[in-house]
Structure formats: structure tokens, C-alpha cells
Curated annotation (Swiss-Prot):
It comes from the Archaea. Part of the 50S ribosomal subunit. Interacts with protein L18 and the 5S rRNA, and probably with tRNAs. Forms a bridge to the 30S subunit in the 70S ribosome. Pfam families: Ribosomal_L5, Ribosomal_L5_C. GO terms for cellular component: ribonucleoprotein complex; ribosome. This is 1 of 5 proteins that mediates the attachment of the 5S rRNA onto the large ribosomal subunit, stabilizing the orientation of adjacent RNA domains. Forms part of the central protuberance. Modeling places the A and P site tRNAs in close proximity to this protein; the 5S rRNA and some of its associated proteins might help stabilize positioning of ribosome-bound tRNAs. In the 70S ribosome it is thought to contact protein S13 of the 30S subunit (bridge B1b), connecting the 2 subunits; this bridge is implicated in subunit movement. SUPFAM superfamilies: RL5-like. The gene is rpl5. It comes from Haloarcula marismortui (strain ATCC 43049 / DSM 3752 / JCM 8966 / VKM B-1809). Belongs to the universal ribosomal protein uL5 family. This is Large ribosomal subunit protein uL5. GO terms for molecular function: rRNA binding; structural constituent of ribosome; tRNA binding.
């Protein structure tokens, strides 16, 4: 059942990492025209309609009440996630400190105008965005399913070193120490 690569005998298709999802988020801090602009920008960059995020609790210092719309996000999966990362990863400088214990990582893009499809418009301004990438191995659904769920064995869990190697080889980016 196992297939071996020409360079070594340790390749196994069930151990190959893959992208489960990519979440692109813009936190504005308040609703109104700025939030509508952010939603438009997210829609143009990702090709998918964003959903509004709401405040989880009231923060008096920032004049935010629980339930107020304060941001927008888009969740990308499969080919759309791959295409977005092809565009977004060259805009960011990744470090190993951005990877968590399970191989997921996040990075920020300071200006939306860095994307090739975007140009500066003085009436809109400049917005930054956060990108979170969730990496998994085949078989992770076992831990998430409702019936007969099991924990993932330690040797099958994704670690930061495997995630860095996957990102560097797949997207031709360099992850610094």
C-alpha cells in the first residue's frame, strides 16, 4: 500500500501535509463605511464574499459593544486557498516563530495595495489583513467526526518542522529562523 519516492524510502501519501483552510481577516474596530470598504477589498482579493465578524464582549475604552460588527473574514478551501497562498505568501516574510505546535501559521499583510489586483484609492485608504493557514494530514477527520472519534497518534501529528518544509517546497518561499 505504500509508495516510495526515488530519492528516499520515507514518503507515504498519508503523511503528506495539505491545506485544510485559509482564513483571511480584516479587523476594523467599528462598522460603517470603513467596514463596507474592507468587505469590498476582501471580496476582490479572495474572489469570495466575506462574512462580518462581531464583537464577543463589550469594551468601553474602545466604545465597542457586544454584537457590534467590527471586522470581516473569508474562509478559503481547496483550490481557492492554494491560489490565494500563491499570491499572498511572496508578500510576507515568514519566520519559524509564526508556526504553532500543530503546524498552523499566521502572517499579516500591512497594506492591501501590495496585492497585484489592488491599487491605491485615496477615497478608500489602506487596510491591512491577517492570514491564518491551517495545515493537516489525511486522517485528521477522525478526531473531528461525531461518531467514533479518536485522537490523532503523536507520530501522525503535524509539527512545525514538517509544516515549514511543506511550505518551503510547495510555495517556493523561505522561512527564516
Amino acid at each position: 500500500m505504500s509508495s516510495e519516492s526515488e530519492s528516499g524510502g520515507d514518503f507515504h501519501e498519508m503523511r503528506e501535509p495539505r491545506i485544510e483552510k485559509v482564513v483571511v481577516h480584516m479587523g476594523i474596530g467599528h462598522g460603517g463605511r470603513d467596514l463596507a470598504n474592507a468587505e469590498d477589498i476582501l471580496g476582490e482579493i479572495t474572489g469570495q464574499m466575506p462574512v462580518r465578524t462581531k464583537a464577543k464582549r463589550t469594551v468601553g475604552e474602545f466604545d465597542i459593544r457586544e454584537g457590534d460588527p467590527i471586522g470581516a473574514k473569508v474562509t478559503l478551501r481547496d483550490e481557492m486557498a492554494e491560489e490565494f497562498l500563491q499570491t499572498a505568501l511572496p508578500l510576507a516574510e515568514l519566520a519559524t516563530s509564526q508556526f504553532d505546535d500543530t503546524g498552523n501559521f499566521s502572517f499579516g499583510v500591512e497594506e492591501h495595495t501590495e496585492f497585484p489586483s489592488q491599487e491605491y484609492d485615496p477615497s478608500i485608504g489602506i487596510y491591512g489583513l491577517d492570514v491564518t493557514v491551517n495545515l493537516v494530514r489525511p486522517g485528521y477527520r477522525v478526531a473531528k467526526r461525531d461518531k467514533a472519534s479518536r485522537s490523532i497518534p503523536t507520530k501522525h501529528r503535524l509539527n512545525p518542522a514538517d509544516a515549514v518544509a511543506f511550505i518551503e517546497s510547495t510555495y517556493d518561499v523561505e522561512v527564516s529562523e
